[in-house]
Amino acid sequence: MKKLLVACCLLSGFASTSVLADAAQDLQSRLAKVNSFHASFSQTVTSSDGAAVQQGEGELWVKRPNLFNWHMTSPDESVLVSDGQTLWFYNPFVEQVTATWLKNATGNTPFMLITRNNANDWKQYNVKQKGNDFELTPKSSSGNLKQFAISVDNSGTIRNFAAVEQDGQRSSYTLKSQQNVAADASKFKFTPPKGVTLDDQRQ
């Protein structure tokens, strides 16, 4: 399920509790300005020593709070879809689909933070702000995420985001051509293709 985490950038700022709270509130309010959007993205994954691990690209559709479709098209195709209840992860290369309840999805993955924009999720982080750049550090060190950063302007448009894992690996995403339009409902529906293995974890 590590690819589920691959979704997610930058900089620091202030330190007082009130400032941290204000930064979190500002980030939430910015993201809340856009309820539905489509964008293409480029991905860069680097190791802890800065060496290039992977370059990729794909498309993203979001309808907050619980609908999204993350389609990685290269170098290997993968699809992550939420229909509002079930989280579907499809890897065509290995012909396998994993299904989990969305309500059980952890709030400590960058992509879930962006799409849900849930107040309870943000409470799990210390948030610092410098202009349009927000840096999030988990209050708990038990998860795989070490740091998450996102750049979002006053209109709610996401420019880029990145996640740094505990081992130092960094996954950076740059969004392009964001269009704040309602996506077709079919983008948020998923039916496992015939012949694939279904790992249903909703039991």
UniProtKB/Swiss-Prot annotation:
A Pfam family recorded for this sequence: LolA
InterPro entries: LolA/LolB/LppX, OM_lipoprot_carrier_LolA-like, OM_lipoprot_carrier_LolA_Pbac
Entry GO CC: outer membrane-bounded periplasmic space
GO biological process: lipoprotein localization to outer membrane; lipoprotein transport
Statement: the UniProt record of this protein carries the keyword Oxidoreductase: no
Main location: periplasm
Main function: Participates in the translocation of lipoproteins from the inner membrane to the outer membrane. Only forms a complex with a lipoprotein if the residue after the N-terminal Cys is not an aspartate (The Asp acts as a targeting signal to indicate that the lipoprotein should stay in the inner membrane).
HAMAP family in UniProt: LolA
Family: Belongs to the LolA family.
Subunit structure: Monomer.
Listed name of the protein: Outer-membrane lipoprotein carrier protein
Species: Serratia proteamaculans (strain 568)
